[in-house]
Amino acid sequence: MSRLDSFITRMQAQRDGLNFLKDKVDGLPGPILEIGLGNGRSYDHLRQLFPGRDIYVFERKVAAHPDCIPPDDRLFTGDVQESLPRAARQLGQRAALVHTDLGTGEHEAHMAMGVWLGPSIDLLVGPGGYVYSNQPLAVARWEQLPNPPGVPADRYYLYRAR
């Protein structure tokens, strides 16, 4: 698969998965978390799906389109290994949805990231909350769910906290 095709597949998986989760998340209390702002596309999509909902964003260094940058009080900057525990102290374990699209472009490093990322996210996701991740995450209190329709296996992973 070309890099362009891979990018398009990833973007479709993001959109389709977030759209699939909209009705499920609407009935849950708590904020939405976007881990990895990048260019701000999925954050912008989350704002459209969940108007009026608190959306907190995590990004090492913001370089997104100006229209897609969250307000300062909803933005955690710096290394995500440090900002996730900081956010957990501030927000608690109550997120209704956590969407993460982090990666290094290198398979082994990407998989290693998932080892610490899952437990870090678990500090934030509330009971019954959803985690939609571009990497496999192993957390004991989460149940892995089937992927949303149209989302290829091993492209994204869907979990629900117990």
Model-identified regions with their sequence ranges:
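Class I SAM-dependent methyltransferase Rossmann-like catalytic core
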Residues: 1-30
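Conserved class I S-adenosyl-L-methionine
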Residues: 28-38
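Local beta-strand N-terminus motif with an aromatic residue
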Residues: 29, 94-95
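Glycine-rich SAM-binding Motif I of class I
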Residues: 40-44
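Conserved SAM-binding motif I beta-strand of class I
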Residues: 54-59
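S-adenosyl-L-methionine
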Residues: 61-92
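A short SAM/SAH-binding and catalytic strip from SAM-dependent methyltransferases
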Residues: 95-111
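C-terminal substrate-binding/active-site "lid" region of AdoMet-derived donor-dependent transferases
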Residues: 108-162
